[in-house]
Amino acid sequence: MKRPMSTDSLCRPSDIVSPSIVVESELTDFDADQRLLAMSGVSLVIFTSVGCASCRYARQVLPGLPLAIDRLCWIDAGDNGGLVERYQVFHLPALFVVRDGEFFGALHTRLTADALNAALAQALNRTAEELP
């Protein structure tokens, strides 16, 4: 079976499939609570912004890392002020862990597979809380 060709950012033909190893979702003020409560497994919730260089790096790198998660949930901090306030986001990118609709807090770590997986394991050993 032949895969369809696509183009890269310079419009050159490419048959490379996205390197993402996890499901990715975009969440908003309007649907984040409902969707996070309904999702089973581990979700890494990441607040980003268009003008943030570290956020662009996170968007590029995180989908391809071998992380112990089921999905990445992206939230644009500039467009979703209600979530930014409720999650008390003060820096970007900001990472949080949700498992089976329960909140396990923030992650403060480097954006590498080893560091993130260690921080995820530590976070998931905390007592779960309700979503903010």
Residue ranges of predicted features:
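Structural micro-motif
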Residues: 87-96
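Non-catalytic, surface beta->alpha helical segment in thiol-disulfide oxidoreductase systems
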Residues: 97-132
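Thiol-based oxidoreductase modules, predominantly thioredoxin-like and allied folds used
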Residues: 47, 69-83
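Short alpha-helical
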Residues: 53, 79-82, 111
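Short amphipathic alpha-helix with an adjacent loop that forms part of the alpha/beta core around
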Residues: 35, 85-87
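Structural signal for short hydrophobic segments within the conserved structured cores
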Residues: 25, 73, 104-106
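Local sequence-structure signature of Cys/Sec-based thiol-disulfide redox active-site neighborhoods
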Residues: 32-64
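N-terminal leader/targeting and pre-domain segments
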Residues: 1-42, 125-132
